[in-house]
Curated annotation (Swiss-Prot):
The protein's name: Ornithine carbamoyltransferase
A Pfam family per the record: OTCace
Associated pathway: Amino-acid biosynthesis; L-arginine biosynthesis; L-arginine from L-ornithine and carbamoyl phosphate: step 1/3
Keywords from the UniProt entry: Amino-acid biosynthesis, Arginine biosynthesis, Cytoplasm, Transferase
Family membership: Belongs to the aspartate/ornithine carbamoyltransferase superfamily. OTCase family.
InterPro entries, per the entry: Asp/Orn_carbamoyltranf_P-bd, Asp/Orn_carbamoylTrfase, Asp/Orn_carbamoylTrfase_sf, Asp_carbamoyltransf_Asp/Orn-bd, Orn/put_carbamltrans, OTCase_ArgI
Top-level EC class: transferase
Role, per record: Reversibly catalyzes the transfer of the carbamoyl group from carbamoyl phosphate (CP) to the N(epsilon) atom of ornithine (ORN) to produce L-citrulline.
Subcellular localization(s) per the UniProt record: Cytoplasm
UniProt binding sites for L-ornithine: 162, 222, 226-227
Length: 304
């Protein structure tokens, strides 16, 4: 039987994603009530970090432990994936030792090669192309605050990066409309836009932040230059019109939420009054990485 990988939102059915989402919402409530279960007792998760991250490491480590399992941290320098040993061979060996593998890496092809050869589930904790765990946390956060996300409109303003790619895939899988405003030359990859549109998603891409956020239910942004993507930096003057500030938020819906995956560069992509304001749910997002990923782990390992 093939392992249940969590590689991208496009690679998991809408029904399975909804199962994971509903489990995450229920699992968080149970955890808060002190009635959470430990369905992954005796299981071991290998965590490979070729790109560092505080939130990802802590949330997966704590999440696995809350489910009764254990974790093994492996840094990029320790692993030397594809250098000292092929990625395929590493995947086969790790599969003999652990029950699941989480990887945060650079090229998306490295994730896919690992999953191709692994005989245990592989989870995408981030690549340069996508960040599906973050979007599961974002959708969970939206639904906690505003109810079902289906039929709602989400706006993105800023760089066409990996978080946006997964947000676009989420539009097809969860049924929300997606508006995007990015500078010329910073558009998301056509592959993700075309896939989502072919799946029936309502996608609007423009270069005008005011147009993208008009009347929307949620405004999302991220850093203007992602980690290890400094070669794409184009200067703050290019991105300044896409800053999320009070004036831009005023053009969104009256009860629109503001989201950011963090860490944020305050005063750049978002102003203090927005990220610290009443519409901001950024720390709920960060918290929900823990609970969303617990349900992803449980789904991959057959516990839901």
């Amino acid at each position: 039987m093939s392992p249940k990988h969590f590689l991208d939102l496009s690679a998991v059915t809408s029904a399975d994603l909804r199962t994971i989402m509903n489990d995450a919402l229920a699992r968080k409530q149970a955890f808060k009530a002190g009635t959470g279960d430990k369905p992954l007792a005796g299981k071991m998760l290998a965590m490979i970090f070729e790109k560092p991250s505080t939130r990802t490491r802590v949330s997966f480590d704590v999440g696995m432990r809350q489910l009764g399992g254990e974790t093994l941290f492996l840094s990029g320098t320790e692993m030397q994936l594809g250098r000292a040993e092929t990625i395929g061979d590493t995947a086969k060996v790790l599969s003999r030792y652990v029950d699941a593998i989480m990887i945060r890496t650079t090229e998306h092809s490295r994730l896919l090669e690992l999953a191709q050869h692994a005989t245990v589930p592989v989870i995408n904790a981030l690549t340069d192309d996508t960040h599906p765990c973050q979007i599961m946390a974002d959708i969970m956060t939206f639904e906690e605050h505003r109810g079902p996300i289906k039929g709602k409109t989400i706006a993105w303003t800023g760089d066409g990066n990996n978080v946006l790619h997964s947000l676009v895939e989420g539009a097809a899988r969860f049924g929300y409309r997606m508006n995007m405003a990015v500078p010329l030359g910073s558009e998301p990859k056509d592959h993700y836009l075309n896939w989502a549109r072919n799946e029936g998603a309502e996608i609007m891409l423009c270069h005008d932040a005011d147009r993208a956020v008009a009347g929307v239910d949620c405004v999302v942004t991220d850093t203007w230059v992602s980690m290890n993507q400094e070669h794409r930096a184009r200067g703050h003057n290019v991105f300044q019109p896409y800053q999320v500030n009070a004036a831009l938020m005023a053009k969104a819906g009256n009860d629109a939420l503001f989201m950011h995956c963090l860490p944020a560069h305050r005063g750049e992509e978002v102003t203090d009054d927005v990220i610290d304001g009443p519409q901001s749910v950024v720390f709920d997002e960060a918290e929900n990485r823990l609970h969303a990923q617990k349900s992803i782990l449980a789904w991959c390992l057959g516990a839901i």
